[in-house]
Swiss-Prot record:
The lineage of its organism: Bacteria, Pseudomonadati, Pseudomonadota, Alphaproteobacteria, Maricaulales. Disulfide bonds join 132-368. Residues 1-21 are annotated as: Disordered. Specifically methylates position 2 of adenine 2503 in 23S rRNA and position 2 of adenine 37 in tRNAs. m2A2503 modification seems to play a crucial role in the proofreading step occurring at the peptidyl transferase center and thus would serve to optimize ribosomal fidelity. This is Dual-specificity RNA methyltransferase RlmN. Keywords: 4Fe-4S, Cytoplasm, Disulfide bond, Iron, Iron-sulfur, Metal-binding, Methyltransferase, rRNA processing, S-adenosyl-L-methionine, Transferase, tRNA processing. The active site is at residues 118, 368.
Length: 396
């Protein structure tokens, strides 16, 4: 039986490489179990033994985080040499790493020439922390309070590129091999650049890899996917991933939400709330997190707090109140702290947990709503010319 691993199909958005440039070997880091099985077959392993070899590769890549085939000591030297001739173990390039005064770390990662995303590690006061990952470069939603919304969508990230963000952070934090003791990254939040539900296939595959107990092993219950309200995909997200759900809400009526989150014009609040109520597994042990950015004089009145309580009636939920994090030329100001506390008091008295999120990483523009890269979308006509220059079909 013939088997072919189509690496180009996995990275269909990646730009073509000029023929004069040595072609980079495809990396095993970010591949699924099935893809690793096909790699084994491609390297001459008998089909009946390929699953076992894939398991070995998986453990070395995702449990131990190795970056050299020489470290894979339970795989024969001959097989390692064959694999190393065809594949690599590299991560995407880490361009910049900034550390905030509060310990927050921001990583600028180059996925391809001119294509960059940002990832943020947020340490907790206890021995835990969350890694905020991106699912797209840029965004299409144009939320008016979010810096990423000022950057046009460049492209979706592949599952491998999402997983790579976790691996790069673990490299930096010295978190290999995987251990249940003294972990720094205990939670994954899809709250970085982009709308995850507009890239659900790759997001779901990345969660399968990240949550696997024999690898990185960050469970689905410790993974939260945030959406601005892509209603048709919410139930599918729950069915496919089993993760926690967060909603980027920010307003309690359609008029204001249309302004803050323009996606609301397509999927208004009544449709959004119905989709949330249908989320698989919803209950007191699996509450929805509602994110509410506090904008001075815009959505922070006590009347809005009461309207929020009414809107969420009957939904197991907690509300994260997020002090607005400014960015250059942003049109909003953060609510006064006394007003935020008064707002939280109304929500708390109604029986909802409503923690006020402590701003983290503001000094390095790593806080909520501040992420943005300088990547720009390459026009389709330019990509076609690149493909023709490489001798490929313009439709490739």
């Amino acid at each position: 039986m013939n088997h072919a691993l189509n690496i180009d199909a996995r990275n269909g958005n990646a730009p073509r490489i000029d023929e004069t440039t040595p072609r980079a070997l495809p990396s095993l880091a970010g591949m699924t179990r099935e893809e690793l099985r096909l790699v084994a077959i491609d390297c001459g392993v008998e089909e009946k033994k390929a699953k076992m070899r894939a398991e070995q590769l998986w453990r070395w890549i995702y449990h131990y985080g190795v970056t050299s085939f020489d470290e894979m000591t339970n795989i024969s030297k001959d097989l390692r040499a064959v694999i190393a001739d065809k594949y690599a173990l590299h991560r995407p390039k880490l361009i910049d790493r900034q550390v905030s005064v509060d310990g927050t770390r921001k990583y600028l990662i180059e996925l391809a020439p001119g294509v960059e995303c940002e990832t943020v590690f947020i340490p907790d006061v206890a021995r835990s922390g969350a890694l905020c990952v991106s699912s797209q470069v840029g965004c299409t939603l144009n939320c008016t309070f979010c810096h990423t919304g000022t950057q046009a969508l460049v492209r979706n990230l592949t599952a491998a590129e999402i997983v790579a963000q976790v691996m790069i952070a673990r490299d930096d934090l010295d978190e290999w091999p995987t251990s249940n003791e003294n972990r720094k990254i205990t939670n994954i939040v899809f709250m970085g650049m982009g709308e995850p539900l507009y890239n659900l296939d790759h997001v779901a595959t990345s969660i399968d890899i990240i949550s696997d107990g024999e690898g990185i092993a960050i469970s689905r219950r410790r993974t939260t996917v945030s959406t601005s309200g892509v209603v048709p995909k919410i139930e599918e997200l729950g069915a496919r991933t089993g993760t926690m759900l967060a909603i980027s809400l920010h307003a309690t009526n359609d008029t204001l939400r249309d302004e803050l989150v323009p996606l609301n014009k397509k999927y208004p609040l009544v449709e959004l709330m119905n989709a949330i109520r249908a989320y698989p597994g919803l209950g007191n042990s699996k509450r929805v997190t509602f994110e509410y950015v506090m904008l001075k004089g815009v959505n922070d009145s006590l009347a809005e707090a009461k309207a929020l309580v009414k809107l969420l009636k009957g939904i197991p939920a907690k509300i994260n109140l997020i002090p607005f994090n400014p960015w250059p030329k942003s049109p909003y100001e953060c609510s006064d702290w006394d007003q935020i506390e008064a707002f939280a008091d109304v929500v708390n008295k109604a029986g909802y947990a409503s923690p006020i999120r402590t701003p983290r990483g503001r000094d390095i523009f790593a806080a909520c709503g501040q992420l943005r890269s300088e990547s720009q979308k390459v026009k389709a006509s330019v990509l076609r010319k690149q493909r023709l220059a490489d001798g490929a079909s313009p439709q490739a």
